[in-house]
Regions:
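Chalcogenol-based redox active-site neighborhoods
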Residues: 1-220
Length: 220
C-alpha cells in the first residue's frame, strides 16, 4: 500500500517496551510522531533516539505522543536503551515498537511486500529504507512524511518545527513560509478571499503581490 499525505495511518497492534498498544487507540485525541530506524545497536540510530529522548518534553507540550520502531524484538530495544542513556545522556521514556515480523514496516511502506515475515538475519543495510518519520493528526491521517538515508541522522528539531506548522495550519487557514519558526509571520492561503481575510484579519496584511498575503501568526 502506497502511503501519501492525508492517507489514513495504518492501524496495528504491537508489543512495545511499555507493553502492548493498539495504535489508533494509543494516539487518542492528540497527535503522534512515529519514527523508525533500521536496526538496534547501530551508531547513527543511537544518537537519534537519545536526542529524541531529550526532546520529548517539547512534544509533550504540544499534545503529541512519540513512538520509535524497528524490526528488532522488544527485548533488544530494552537492552539498547541502556546504551542510549549511557552514551547520549537521556533515558528513553517513550515506547519503542518491536516489529520482528515486519508487519508495521511493511504496512507503512518502509519495506516492500516481498521483504518476508521475519527480521532474523536481516542487516541494517537490508532495512535501509526504515529510517522514516510520520506525523499523524488526531484524525489518524498522515500529515507529513520524511525518509532519510542510512548515512544521515535526522534533524528532530526540524521534525518539531514541522509538527508546529502542521498543528497551526490545521486550526487556521494559513501556510508557513520558508524557514518559518513558531511566532513568525505566516501566509494567508489562496482559498481565503480578500473579503473573508478582512474579517479574519481586521488589522490587514502585507501583500508584495496579490497572491502573497502576509500576516502575524494567529494565536491559539
Amino acid at each position: 500500500m502506497t502511503l501519501r499525505i492525508n492517507s489514513t495511518a495504518p492501524d496495528f497492534k504491537a508489543e512495545t517496551t511499555q507493553g502492548p498498544i493498539e495504535f489508533h487507540k494509543w494516539i487518542g485525541d492528540g497527535w503522534a510522531v512515529l519514527f523508525s530506524h533500521p536496526k538496534d545497536f547501530t551508531p547513527v540510530c543511537t544518537t537519534e533516539l537519545g536526542y529524541m529522548a531529550g526532546l520529548k518534553p517539547e512534544f509533550d507540550k504540544r499534545n503529541t505522543k512519540i513512538v520509535g520502531l524497528s524490526v528488532d524484538p522488544v527485548a533488544n530495544h530494552s537492552k539498547w536503551a541502556k546504551d542510549i542513556e549511557e552514551t547520549q545522556g537521556h533515558a528513553v521514556t517513550y515506547p519503542m515498537i518491536g516489529d520482528p515480523e515486519l508487519k508495521v514496516a511493511t504496512a507503512y511502506d518502509m519495506l516492500p511486500e516481498g521483504a518476508g515475515t521475519t527480521s532474523e538475519g536481516r542487516t541494517a543495510a537490508d532495512n535501509a529504507t526504515v529510517r522514516s518519520v510520520f506525523i499523524i493528526g488526531p484524525d489518524t491521517k498522515i500529515k507529513a512524511m520524511l525518509t532519510y538515508p542510512m548515512s544521515t541522522g535526522r534533524n528532530f528539531d526540524e521534525v518539531l518545527r514541522l509538527l508546529e506548522s502542521c498543528q497551526l495550519t490545521a486550526k487556521h487557514q494559513v501556510a508557513t513560509p520558508v524557514n518559518w519558526k513558531k511566532g513568525e509571520d505566516v501566509i494567508i492561503v489562496p482559498a481565503v478571499s480578500d473579503e473573508a481575510a478582512k474579517a479574519k484579519y481586521p488589522g490587514g496584511w502585507k501583500a508584495p503581490k496579490p497572491y502573497l498575503r502576509i500576516v502575524p501568526q494567529p494565536r491559539d
